[in-house]
Amino acid sequence: MQSYFNELEQVRYEGSQSTNPLAFHHYNPDEMILGKRMADHLRFAACYWHTFCWGGADMFGANAFDRPWQQPGDALALAKRKAEVAFEFFHKLNVPYYCFHDVDVSPEGASLQEYLNNFAVMTDVLAEKQAASGVKLLWGTANCFTHPRYGAGAATNPDPEVFSWAATQVFTAMNATRQLGGENYVLWGGREGYETLLNTDLRQEREQIGRFMQMVVEHKHKTGFQGTLLIEPKPQEPTKHQYDYDVATVYGFLKQFGLEKEIKVNIEANHATLAGHSFHHEIASAIALGIFGSVDANRGDPQLGWDTDQFPNSVEENTLVMFEILKAGGFTTGGLNFDAKVRRQSTDKYDLFYGHIGAMDTMALALKFAAKMIEDGQLDQIVAKRYAGWNSELGQQILQGKMSLEELSRYASQHNLNPQHQSGHQELLENKVNRYLFG
């Protein structure tokens, strides 16, 4: 079949002095960072949905892109053409992974049986493409939010028949992900929330989604899927309030249903800021709670209150993110998926490459600077010194439950405690970070 991106052979590393816009300037896959290849640290993935499914429409305008696979015609044939172009893109971009929703890669059809038949065909097509290209599946998921049946949610829907349809989609998408060697399976509750409490039973819906997640875990173990299950937090949009609001909320939900050892989180930068947090905060929180899994790398617009899904371009922001990830030992099954799309006015097909190349260079620089921070160790030393008192006999007795509130009160009185505030040195630390970044 004719190449779609026929003016490009493959994006390669050419160094920071290159002026070629279709080359990497900082991302060198084989460069060794802290004893590991850069590619193995970053584990880049391109997403199917924004890159090959979005037609450029927004709330005020129709599709703006002229994609051959988005024209009228046989849906299954167009899906196969889209797969051809997608894997050409993955290969030429030199990304090791990709991600998809079920209906990104396969036509939904007019019935449940058509959905199942189409997805089975396209799973075989994807398997062939993976084998031929060497590109692997980072994670799969099911779209249980776009179809009108999911207007009131999927797992939280008041109709158990809708719940059952969603269960069928997740069951099928999990099986496809396992068949394709996917390293994770993601659950995003796009409409698992409410518009108004006037028609919502919060306890009922929480019990429903809790049971749904338990069934997902049960199916994982029954089938022997070795990947990681991930929930992707988001506070709102499309619903007014969503139950997977942020990392801390997800952790509380997992604890309630006994799933905190079974499910981790896939953190998206733009979702973090919509929740009123920094991307750095959500990453650090997930690591502290032991549920860090994977990342959707993108950014929002601080002047806009919705999910703009722009490509990441802040080295400063992402250096702190990569610093946390490196300190925690790096990714295991997760990676950096670019859940990002070109702007509606970016109608040149090579804009898809420009967006991803810039994002990959951004994350590569962030990795390099984070590695410098790790190697230097000054930030960790300052933090360790700040909390050193908790390694003392008093601190350890408190943490180990060897002192009651009454005993602590007696200790403070007997030792005439008069602790003095010690500086947090925030400005000093910020200056140190800037020196890592800018010299």
From Swiss-Prot:
Gene: xylA
Superkingdom of source: Bacteria
UniProt: Mg(2+) 1 binding residues: 232, 268, 296, 339
Main location class: cytoplasm
Cofactor note: Binds 2 magnesium ions per subunit.
GO molecular function: magnesium ion binding; xylose isomerase activity
Biological process, per Gene Ontology: D-xylose catabolic process
Native source organism of the sequence: Yersinia pestis
Protein name in UniProt: Xylose isomerase
Keywords: Carbohydrate metabolism, Cytoplasm, Isomerase, Magnesium, Metal-binding, Xylose metabolism
